[in-house]
UniProtKB/Swiss-Prot annotation:
Its EC number is 4.2.1.11. It is found in: Cytoplasm; Secreted; Cell surface. Belongs to the enolase family. Keywords: Cytoplasm, Glycolysis, Lyase, Magnesium, Metal-binding, Secreted. SUPFAM superfamilies: Enolase C-terminal domain-like (SSF51604), Enolase N-terminal domain-like (SSF54826). It comes from Clostridioides difficile (strain 630) (Peptoclostridium difficile). Mg(2+) binds at D242, E287, D314. GO terms for molecular function: magnesium ion binding; phosphopyruvate hydratase activity. This is Enolase. One of its GO terms (biological process) is glycolytic process. InterPro entries: Enolase, Enolase-like_C_sf, Enolase-like_N, Enolase_C, Enolase_CS, Enolase_N. Its main location: cytoplasm. It catalyses: (2R)-2-phosphoglycerate = phosphoenolpyruvate + H2O.
Length: 430
């Protein structure tokens, strides 16, 4: 039977050593699902609320015992006895129990943990891998990995302003080869940095985090690493950026502060900077190029570069259909970053992806900087045929767990597996 018999949450640790919520859901016949909720460092103001205890005497105020109690004492009694296959109804009940627009009462970390665990338990009940349970028979496209191999901003303790410099192995024949290419470039970059006397320590997402003279230098180093690994920049491997511009935006001066370079730029100057970079480096995607509330700047960015670059809204959209709808109506961005904990349920996540695709936007499935061994997003990427996944460098087990799951999925799908490379950027006109 697919009836939920037990829902239980506990406090565990994420990749930064901070507490997070783990939930187990057990069905009547013993089928079980377990899920762990991730956590972000650079978070959008419009994200669903991650509930923390605030007790400075315990985990420096970052404990999640309140969220755990909300699962065990409030959510569990309401959904135990429900059918695990009725994911929309279960998610709707949790949203109703919370009663706030941002899940601020029970916590998105409490609600999401249950939502993911229910999906896993339902998949286990019928003996299907999660990607097939969520996506059906047509779930067979493996995503291009967007590998963050050089970290800056909020993800590293260095002077680099741009938060993430990514490589995308678009020239690979399959995911397995794409992962190999990315790993080889990653190791090549380590060698390049070492030869130049630069630090090879890694940031939150597994990428290197050296101090550099400029953001442009980071791009130059990665291009050098791609070449030394035996690949052609712009053909085998493309570049991507997550600027996380909200973190550098001064709301009083309405300028973007590139502290590492000692510059303050207007939105128009930021757009010109991106245009210059994209003309000189094989960049195909830029995430959060402007502040989450700079709609006029985003409009300009999209008009100038939206035909040649994937412009991804993360803080801009926060996996929220209301904000995404506003972006679609105003011709802002052309892609949405999908983070399950930004919205808080599997159902709402799938709704956001569906809305994006219907509007011709791409959807990029993403991790958070505070991750765990949970690999749900790997299955989700294939379930919705997203075509792209962003889950860090091929370094640190919390990142590699997702890549290893995708290797398994590619084997399971077998000859029907597709890896679309550049075709994953289906809305670009260049």
């Amino acid at each position: 039977m697919s009836v939920i018999e037990l829902v239980y949450a506990r406090e565990v640790l994420d990749s930064r050593g901070n507490p997070t919520v783990e939930v187990e859901v057990v069905l009547e016949d013993g089928a079980m699902g377990r899920a762990i909720v991730p956590s972000g460092a650079s978070t959008g103001a419009f994200e669903a609320v991650e509930l923390r205890d605030g007790d400075k005497g315990r985990y420096l105020g970052k404990g999640v015992e309140t969220a755990v109690a909300n699962v065990n004492e409030i959510i569990a009694p309401e959904i135990e006895g429900m059918d695990a296959f009725d994911q929309p109804a279960i998610d709707a009940i949790m949203i109703e129990l919370d009663g706030t627009p941002n899940k601020g009462k029970l916590g998105a970390n409490a609600i999401l943990g249950v939502s993911m665990a229910v999906a896993r338990a339902a998949a286990d009940e019928i003996g299907l891998p999660l990607f097939q349970y969520l996506g059906g028979v047509n779930a067979k496209q493996l995503p291009v990995p967007m590998m963050n191999i050089l970290n800056g901003g909020e993800h590293a303790d260095n002077n680099v302003d741009v938060q993430e410099f990514m490589i995308l192995p678009v020239g690979a024949c399959c995911f397995k080869e794409g992962l190999r290419m990315g790993a080889e470039v990653f190791h090549s970059l380590k060698k390049v940095l070492g030869e130049k006397g630069l630090a090879c320590g890694v940031g939150d997402e597994g990428g290197f985090a050296p101090n550099l003279g400029s953001n442009r230098e980071a791009l130059e180093l990665i291009v050098e690493a791609i070449t030394k690994a035996g690949y052609k920049p712009g053909e085998d491997v493309m570049l991507g950026l997550d600027v996380a511009a909200t973190e550098m935006y001064n709301k009083e001066t309405k300028k973007y502060v590139l502290a590492g370079e000692g510059k303050e730029l207007t939105a128009a100057e930021m757009v010109a900077l991106y245009e210059d970079w994209s003309n000189n480096f094989p960049i195909i995607t830029i995430e959060d190029g402007l502040d989450e509330e700079d709609w006029d700047g985003w409009k300009l960015l999209t008009e100038k570069l939206g035909n040649k670059l994937q412009l991804v809204g993360d803080d801009l959209f926060v996996t929220n259909t209301e904000r995404l709808e506003k972006g679609i109506e105003n011709g802002v961005a052309n892609s949405i970053l999908v983070k399950v904990n930004q919205i808080g349920t599997i159902t709402e996540t799938l709704d956001a992806i569906e809305m994006a695709k219907r509007a011709g936007y791409t959807a990029v499935i993403s991790h958070r900087s505070g991750e765990t061994e949970d690999s749900t997003i790997a299955d989700l990427a294939v379930a919705v045929n997203a075509g792209q996944i962003k889950t860090g460098a091929p370094s640190r087990t919390d990142r590699v767990a997702k890549y290893n799951q995708l290797l398994r999925i590619e084997e399971m799908v077998g000859e029907q597996a597709r890896y679309c490379g550049l075709k994953s950027f289906y809305n670009l006109k260049k």
